[in-house]
């Protein structure tokens, strides 16, 4: 009861003592908290054991002055002790509070009583805590005052009022009346002193011991009565003390106020009196201090008088000063105004002069133009020549107004001769390039200059020359010529292709260019400089649900050497995303530090206009190029980002060439892209490009794909983003075509990485990739090879510009045309991805990097790589594939291949032997997509029939990548037949390809699973989830690794997935980052973190391999049982998504070599589908301004499952375990079956 009484007293009694206590507590709760803790501990001991240990009293209380109670502990009744303790505590607090209360406004006489009541609740927390902490929860007697209250609530006050309403009122009265007993304060204070000297711990035992006893309601009442009596006495004392304190405080406050007031007044007076009177004021300060000291004395009135006088003086002085200051300010203002007026007059005069000068200049220019026109009219011998060189002449004639008509004619003849020479040279070069095509690409990395002129460029140039005329050829005769013509080209572009021939003439002719032309050049240069200037670019990564995963992702570009070589530079732009791609090119590539744009979540990019992206590295990453400004005049140029980056010309060329030449080239590229678009690209592709990306994107894409590619022969851009629409044309044929294109592109990018390998090898490579299946693929791939991209499984979300794909260039003209269409669809589309719906025209980031809309394509020199990998199927041609693959998104796989040579070799082999496997594996998503996308499109045979399966087995490789986006919605569920037949065919194929690498077969299985999952992937989340699950299955370890890897850098996850599914990892890089990271990883010059990640992945792979082997053993058994069930199930339960995606995936997966475990794959696939369905919807980076196509949107949500969306943060071990458990549980039903 003592404790209870104490708490009530402190809380509810509003006497001075309580008030002072509470104010003190409010002012120093830290000390109270410490004391409370100690008190609680001791009380808990005493109460729990019911022992009276004289030492139980907390030191806390000892400080409070409880030592004085020691004498009474055993002499007095527990109630008395308790009340004494309460009194002592309150007194001690009052004592301690005297000083602070005197300072605090709370104790002012007016507010004292109110403040006391208000503040009082602060203290209760302490005693009540003691009691509640004591831990004795006695049987509660509601009639009695609550014994232990955990918190301050109304219950105590209610009980108090109910039990002793009168006494409480009396206590209030006492407080008012009992202001006399000031002497009690001394006694109270003396107790604390004794307490400090005494043994602080003896009171409490009795104090707390009383609490257990109050179970008796009667005893409790007695104690309460006694307590209340003592409380009243205590209240009286406290009130008296409070009154005393108030008086003292009032006096002190009054004195302080007086002093302050006097000082202020004196200061004012001193200010008024001025500096001269300051000495007397100082003299007065002594009396002031004396007055302050004797403020309480009667002499205070005199001080006030003096202060008044001083104040008056100070005020007068202040008035004088103010007047003076005002006068000075007015003078200053006048002077300033005069100065301003003078400046204005001068400016006006200058402006007038400038205007006059401008008028004169304009008049002179007009005269010059008139003269030029006259000369032109005279010189117009051959109208054609005049048309071609009309503008050049004007510039030259302006410069040489006095030149005669003969000179003008001579100039025209010179120009014609120069143009004809340039054209001849260009044609010769093209012929040479044609001859060197097979060799050229192999030599490409070594000879950037040749690369520029390699077949793709030659083809483009020829086509463009045929279409756009010889001027383009003249413009692009060579890097040197381009540079020479660069300054004039921007103008030429603006003026038209006809004037293309003029720039060289003008350069030679005009020592000083026309002012207009100079202005234009300066503008272009500025634009180029701006674009080439590496600038950090920041973007936000957000999940589909407006949740900002990364408020700021910084892209800081590393500026590449401008002179590294056009090809190198173009490759660099692409490499920035898949930096590994650049291993082929020794030249320093400009790789942004954040080559991985997608932070593990999705593409992080704010939806920005392409024009907003200034960083060349960024642009190259995004596939934007300098072209922007060049294209701007063209109208398509504004989109510049995708194509240019691809071409890399934006990045590399501008650096290599003068900015103006770069811009001119970009413009020409756009023009050529348009021409090529119309002529080269399939009508579908061109239409698609035009319709979907919009004219800008199409020209941009083509420009980039072709023009830039020409500029920059196959670049090692590993990843390209393909708009889903391009991947999956609206029609199945288009889809298949695109899939083939995509695949060919993937394969080509494989080539691209090792562009050196002949561009033509890609078709062979395609065949090699397909091996058996690839042959059917081969036919397709030739068309597709041009684009040479791979879809990273989930990287489609990754915004990666595909550089002009060397494979595209490499591809034979047939391929080039076919693939050019597909390329236009793929390559151009990739730049266009921004415009996937044609909506994106404006922003590269505008691309909703969602699996649905874009698939990231891993570009590989598939021909060379595949050939090599065929040769070294087990080795995986880590050398060729390693660097190129490393360069390519697969590069990671190759890295993996290097690390796991067999495992990777298989993945590589998959990449290559089943080039589609690689494509499909790498774009496991693409693979799943191809299958999932439209059953027919995935395979060249669009029929979902077993036929298709067979074709799929052969073709799926190519198809898978093409379908990588897997718009399963588009693809009708692959026919169960195809599913059924495919798995076996695929198994055979996968076994063939997979045999070289048993571990890859596991990955293949995983890939198969992933592809199976991905078939659901059309419900994008499933695919991603599938990937995750694959990763989870493959290595729950990988889970942590993989999610963290995405966070760390998709490399780990991608590699881990690679280890598990050698190919899939790339695709698996569910975070667009994965693909880029893979590429980075693969890059020969890997950052430390990449190598470390690879090492970790090796460990993961090994563990996963063992786990997967076990899993496969189990699953193989289950698969045999369930294979039939699975086929039916996948057809039935999978229904559209499973059968469609599943069958497609299976067909793709089988080609991937993952089919060997057909039943197992199906089981896993089913499990993953189930999981995917259960998994949260995807996280998407909503960067794009344009909305993805409806089906794409559906996929988008699914594509990025939240786990993938969260890739940014690594998965904690517990999360991986949880996922593992979830998977195990999800597998139970199948196991039971």
Curated annotation (Swiss-Prot):
Annotated stretches, region: Required for interaction with actin-capping proteins: 321-472
Subunit record text: Directly interacts with actin-capping proteins CAPZA1, CAPZA2 and CAPZB; this interaction decreases the binding of capping proteins to actin.
Biased composition regions of type Basic and acidic residues, renumbered to the chain: 200-211, 282-293, 302-322, 329-362, 432-447, 505-527, 677-707, 768-783, 908-921, 994-1040, 1059-1082, 1099-1124, 1151-1170
Compositionally biased intervals (Low complexity): 876-889, 956-967, 1127-1139
UniProt main location, coarse: cytoplasm
UniProt region (Disordered), positions on chain: 92-136, 157-224, 269-527, 560-586, 629-788, 815-1082, 1097-1186
Subcellular location: Cytoplasm, Cytosol
Compositional bias ranges of the Acidic residues kind: 363-376, 397-407
Pfam families in alphabetical order: DUF4592
Keywords, comma-separated and alphabetical: Cytoplasm, Phosphoprotein
Residues bearing the modification Phosphothreonine: 559, 971
General function of this protein: Involved in epithelial cell integrity by acting on the maintenance of the actin cytoskeleton. Positively regulates the actin polymerization, by inhibiting the interaction of actin-capping proteins with actin.
Comp. bias (Polar residues): 732-742, 815-825, 852-863, 1047-1057, 1174-1183
GO BP of this protein: epithelial structure maintenance; maintenance of gastrointestinal epithelium; negative regulation of barbed-end actin filament capping; positive regulation of actin filament polymerization
The protein's name in its UniProt record: Capping protein-inhibiting regulator of actin dynamics
Tissue expression per record: Expressed in intestinal epithelial cells (at protein level).
PANTHER family associated with the record: CANCER-RELATED REGULATOR OF ACTIN DYNAMICS (PTHR47574), CAPPING PROTEIN-INHIBITING REGULATOR OF ACTIN DYNAMICS (PTHR47574:SF3)
Biased composition (Basic residues): 157-176
Any one annotated GO CC term: cytosol
Residue(s) carrying Phosphoserine: 7, 28, 132, 420, 556, 975, 1017
Pathological association: In colorectal cancers, CRACD gene is observed to be often the target of inactivating mutations. In the absence of genetic mutations, expression levels tend to be down-regulated.
């Amino acid at each position: 009861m003592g404790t209870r009484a104490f708490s009530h007293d402190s809380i509810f009694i509003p006497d001075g003592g309580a008030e002072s206590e509470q104010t003190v507590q409010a002012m120093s709760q830290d000390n109270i908290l410490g004391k409370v803790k100690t008190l609680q501990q001791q009380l808990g001991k005493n109460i729990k054991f019911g022992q009276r240990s004289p030492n139980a009293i907390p030191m806390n209380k000892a400080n409070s002055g409880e030592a004085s109670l020691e004498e009474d502990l055993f002499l007095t009744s527990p109630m008395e002790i308790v009340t004494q303790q309460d009194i002592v505590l309150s007194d001690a607090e009052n004592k301690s509070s005297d000083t602070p209360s005197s300072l605090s406004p709370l104790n002012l006489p007016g507010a004292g009583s109110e403040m006391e009541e208000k503040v009082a609740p602060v203290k209760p927390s302490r005693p009540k805590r003691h009691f509640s902490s004591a831990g004795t929860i006695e049987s509660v007697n509601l009639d009695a005052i609550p014994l232990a209250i955990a918190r301050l609530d109304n219950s105590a006050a209610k009980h108090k009022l109910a039990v002793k309403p009168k006494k409480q009122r009396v206590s209030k009265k006492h407080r008012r009346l009992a202001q006399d007993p000031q002497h009690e304060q001394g006694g109270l204070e003396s107790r604390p002193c004794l307490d400090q000297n005494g043994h602080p711990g003896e009171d409490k035992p009795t104090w707390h011991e009383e609490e257990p006893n109050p179970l008796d309601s009667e005893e409790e009442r007695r104690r309460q009565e006694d307590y209340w009596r003592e409380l009243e006495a205590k209240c009286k004392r406290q009130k008296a003390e409070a009154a005393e304190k108030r008086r003292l405080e009032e006096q002190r406050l009054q004195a302080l106020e007086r002093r302050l007031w006097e000082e202020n007044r004196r200061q004012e007076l001193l200010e008024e009196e001025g500096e001269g009177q300051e000495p007397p004021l100082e003299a007065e300060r002594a009396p002031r201090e004396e007055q302050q000291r004797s403020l309480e004395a009667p002499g205070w009135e005199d001080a006030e008088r003096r202060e008044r006088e001083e104040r008056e003086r100070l005020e007068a002085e202040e008035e004088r000063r103010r007047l003076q200051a005002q006068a000075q300010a007015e003078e200053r203002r006048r002077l300033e105004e005069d100065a301003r007026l003078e400046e204005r007059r001068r400016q006006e005069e200058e402006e007038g002069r400038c205007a006059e000068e401008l008028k004169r200049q304009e008049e002179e220019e007009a005269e010059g133009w008139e003269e030029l026109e006259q000369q032109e009219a005279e010189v117009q011998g051959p109208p054609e020549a005049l048309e071609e060189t009309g503008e050049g002449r004007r510039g030259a004639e302006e410069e040489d107004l006095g030149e005669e008509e003969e000179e003008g004619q001579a100039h025209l003849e010179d120009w014609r001769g120069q143009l004809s020479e340039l054209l001849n040279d260009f044609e010769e070069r093209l012929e040479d390039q044609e001859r060197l095509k097979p060799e050229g690409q192999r030599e490409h990395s070594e000879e950037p200059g040749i690369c520029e002129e390699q077949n793709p460029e030659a083809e483009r140039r020829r086509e463009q020359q045929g279409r756009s005329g010889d001027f383009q050829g003249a413009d692009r005769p060579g890097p040197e010529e381009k540079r020479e013509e660069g300054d004039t080209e921007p103008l030429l572009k603006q003026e038209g292709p006809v004037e293309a021939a003029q720039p060289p003439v003008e350069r030679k002719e005009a020592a000083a260019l026309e002012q207009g032309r100079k202005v234009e050049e300066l503008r272009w240069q500025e634009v180029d400089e701006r674009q080439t200037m590496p600038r950090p670019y920041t973007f936000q990564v957000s999940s589909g649900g407006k949740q900002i995963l990364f408020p700021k992702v910084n892209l800081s570009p590393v500026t590449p050497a401008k002179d590294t070589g056009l090809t190198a530079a173009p490759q660099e732009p692409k490499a920035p995303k898949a930096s590994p791609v650049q291993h082929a090119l020794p030249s320093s590539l400009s790789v942004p530090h954040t080559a991985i744009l997608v932070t593990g979540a999705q593409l992080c990019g704010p939806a920005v206009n392409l024009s907003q992206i200034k960083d060349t590295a960024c642009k190259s990453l995004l596939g934007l190029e300098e072209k922007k400004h060049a294209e701007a005049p063209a109208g398509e140029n504004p989109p510049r980002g995708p194509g240019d980056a691809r071409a890399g010309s934006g990045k590399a060329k501008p650096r290599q060439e003068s900015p103006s030449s770069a811009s001119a080239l970009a413009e020409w590229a756009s023009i050529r892209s348009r021409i090529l678009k119309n002529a080269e690209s399939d009508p579908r592709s061109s239409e698609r490009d035009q319709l979907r990306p919009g004219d800008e994107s199409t020209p941009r894409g083509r420009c980039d794909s072709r023009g830039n590619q020409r500029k920059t022969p196959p670049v090692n851009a590993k990843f390209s983003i393909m708009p889903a629409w391009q991947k999956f044309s609206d029609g199945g044929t288009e889809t298949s075509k695109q899939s083939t294109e995509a695949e060919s592109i993937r394969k080509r990018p494989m080539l691209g990485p090792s562009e050196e390998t002949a561009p033509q090898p890609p078709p062979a490579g395609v065949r090699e990739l397909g091996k058996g299946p690839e042959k059917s693929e081969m036919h397709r791939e030739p068309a597709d090879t041009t684009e040479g991209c791979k879809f990273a499984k989930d990287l489609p979300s990754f915004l990666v510009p595909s550089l002009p794909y060397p494979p595209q260039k490499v591809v034979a003209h047939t391929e080039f045309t076919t693939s050019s269409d597909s390329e236009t669809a793929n390559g151009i589309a990739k730049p266009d991805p921004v415009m996937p719906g044609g909506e994106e025209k404006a922003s590269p980031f505008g691309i909703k990097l969602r699996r649905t809309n874009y698939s990231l394509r891993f570009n590989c020199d598939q021909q060379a790589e595949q050939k090599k990998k065929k040769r070294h199927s087990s080795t995986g041609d880590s050398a060729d594939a390693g660097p190129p693959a490393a360069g390519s998104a697969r590069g990671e796989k190759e890295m993996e291949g290097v690390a796991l040579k067999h495992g990777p070799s298989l993945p590589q082999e998959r990449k290559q032997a089943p080039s589609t496997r690689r494509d499909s594996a790498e774009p496991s998503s693409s693979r799943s997509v191809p299958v999932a996308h439209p059953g027919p499109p995935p395979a060249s045979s669009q029929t979902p029939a077993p036929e298709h399966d067979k074709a799929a087995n052969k073709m799926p490789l190519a198809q898978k990548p093409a379908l990588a986006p897997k718009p399963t919605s588009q693809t009708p569920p692959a026919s169960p037949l195809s599913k059924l037949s495919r798995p076996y065919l695929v198994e055979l194929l996968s076994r063939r390809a997979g045999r070289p690498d048993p571990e890859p077969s596991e990955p293949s299985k995983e890939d198969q699973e992933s592809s199976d999952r991905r078939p659901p992937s059309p419900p994008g989340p499933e695919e991603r989830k599938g990937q995750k699950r694959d990763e989870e299955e493959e290595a729950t370890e990988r889970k942590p690794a993989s999610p963290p890897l995405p966070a760390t850098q998709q490399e780990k996850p991608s590699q881990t997935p690679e280890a598990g599914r050698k190919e899939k990892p790339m695709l698996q890089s569910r975070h667009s980052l994965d693909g880029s990271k893979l590429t980075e990883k693969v890059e020969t010059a890997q950052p430390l973190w990449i190598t470390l990640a690879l090492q970790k992945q090796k460990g993961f792979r090994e563990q996963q391999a063992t786990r997967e082997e076990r899993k496969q053993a189990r699953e193989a058994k289950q698969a045999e049982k369930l294979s039939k069930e699975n086929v039916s199930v996948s057809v039935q339960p999978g229904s559209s998504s499973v059968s469609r995606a599943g069958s497609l995936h299976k067909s793709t997966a089988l080609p991937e070599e993952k089919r060997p475990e057909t039943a197992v794959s199906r089981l896993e696939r089913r499990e993953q589908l189930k999981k995917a369905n259960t998994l949260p919807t995807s996280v998407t980076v909503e960067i794009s301004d344009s909305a993805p196509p409806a089906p794409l949107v559906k996929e988008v949500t699914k594509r990025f499952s939240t786990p993938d969306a969260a890739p940014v943060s690594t998965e904690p071990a517990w999360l991986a375990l949880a996922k593992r458990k979830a998977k195990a549980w999800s597998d139970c039903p199948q196991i039971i079956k």
